[in-house]
Amino acid sequence: MLELDIQRATDAATPEDAALRRWCELALRQRSADSEMTIRLVDEAEGRELNHTYRHKDYATNVLSFPADVPDDLLDIPLLGDLVICVAVVEREAAEQGKSLEAHWAHLVIHGCLHLLGYDHIEDEEAEEMESLERELLAELGHPDPYADDETDTITH
């Protein structure tokens, strides 16, 4: 079971809770244990502030992942961590890249969840594994390969 806390810190239109949950559960299905996580949907100012504070980059990015660093045995439900998603960046990227907004949202939520599971894309081999899993999960939802069109269509964080 996934205990999902969704925080909307913006007045912008965002996906419904059920869609966010569906994307998280799909990405996390390889994890058999119950889990807890938070998704915080933010405006550009908060996105920029968090990206600057934690990554020393002075711009808002699409998704930030904050994996929990608490041993599972200390908690009733293992805490995976938090995702922070900047709504304006998601909307802008989808428009610029000619992607449906729903497909881009699904991609970024899945991408962030995979980071919470320990996947990364710093090294080429890690990136290939992570992107392959993203493609597979998005295909299950009926969404196209997010990396197919252009090498610049990569995750910006």
From Swiss-Prot:
**Residues bound to Zn(2+):** H111, H115, H121
Q: What is its EC number?
A: 3.1.-.-
Q: Which GO terms describe its molecular function?
A: metalloendopeptidase activity; RNA endonuclease activity; zinc ion binding
Q: Name one GO biological process term.
A: rRNA processing
Q: Which cofactor does it need?
A: Zn(2+)
**Which key words are in the record?**
Cytoplasm, Endonuclease, Hydrolase, Metal-binding, Nuclease, Ribosome biogenesis, rRNA processing, Zinc
Keyword check for Nuclease:
yes
Known Pfam families for this protein?
Answer: YbeY
Q: Which PANTHER family match?
A: ENDORIBONUCLEASE YBEY, CHLOROPLASTIC (PTHR46986:SF1)
The UniProt entry, under NCBIfam families, shows:
rRNA maturation RNase YbeY
Q: What does this protein's UniProt record list under function?
A: Single strand-specific metallo-endoribonuclease involved in late-stage 70S ribosome quality control and in maturation of the 3' terminus of the 16S rRNA.
Q: Which family does it belong to?
A: Belongs to the endoribonuclease YbeY family.
What name does this protein carry?
Answer: Endoribonuclease YbeY
Q: What is the lineage of its organism?
A: Bacteria, Pseudomonadati, Pseudomonadota, Gammaproteobacteria, Pseudomonadales
Name of encoding gene? ybeY
